[in-house]
């Protein structure tokens, strides 16, 4: 019998930057997805707090026992179609995977996106992150043939969209 992992989700704080950058980069390295054209090399990864001070943006941090174990955000990426936002920077340390925390973070992002008035959510990912891709499929994301918007992340070659 699997025991439920006790966790909390809150909004990002400035002091979270260093740990979140570590998580993003270590997860990408773990899955051999630390390649050019991804957030691994994106300078905004080092200051997510400032990035998410943008209008209609939010980033949520997951904690277990007051330790940051991951996060996910909603962002109004430039050049996306009207009413569309992007699910961004969903990364979890290994001990948080398979616990429902990733799903809870995404659902929190769905809620925020709807509150901001978005009607669709887009994401970009890579085949190396296949477990996450499976979660996106289960949550109703559908595959696209081409990218949307202008994220600058040319290293991502899976694009998905969901109606909110």
Functional labels for PLM-detected ranges:
Residues 18, 99, 158:
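Glycine-centered loop/turn positions within well-structured domains
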Residues 1-6:
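Basic/polar N-terminal segments that are highly enriched at the extreme N-terminus
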Residues 7, 11-95, 106-108, 112, ...:
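Acetyl-CoA-dependent GNAT
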Residues 67, 80-81, 93-107, 114-116, ...:
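Conserved glycine-rich acetyl-CoA-binding loop
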Residues 119-122, 126-164:
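C-terminal "cap" of GNAT-fold acetyltransferases
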């Amino acid at each position: 019998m699997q025991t439920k992992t006790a966790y909390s989700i809150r909004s990002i704080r400035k002091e979270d930057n260093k740990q979140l950058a570590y998580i993003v980069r270590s997860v990408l390295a773990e899955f051999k997805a630390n390649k050019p054209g991804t957030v691994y090399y994106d300078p905004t990864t080092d200051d997510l707090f400032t990035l998410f001070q943008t209008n209609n943006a939010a980033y949520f941090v997951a904690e277990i026992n007051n330790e940051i174990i991951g996060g996910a955000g909603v962002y109004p990426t430039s050049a996306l179609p009207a009413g569309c936002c992007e699910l961004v920077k969903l990364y979890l340390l290994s001990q948080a995977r398979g616990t429902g925390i990733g799903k809870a973070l995404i659902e929190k992002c769905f809620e925020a996106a709807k509150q901001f008035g978005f009607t669709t959510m887009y994401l970009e990912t890579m085949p190396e992150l296949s477990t996450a891709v499976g979660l996106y499929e289960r949550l109703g994301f559908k595959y696209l043939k081409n990218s949307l918007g202008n994220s600058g992340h040319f290293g991502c070659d899976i694009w998905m969209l969901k109606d909110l």
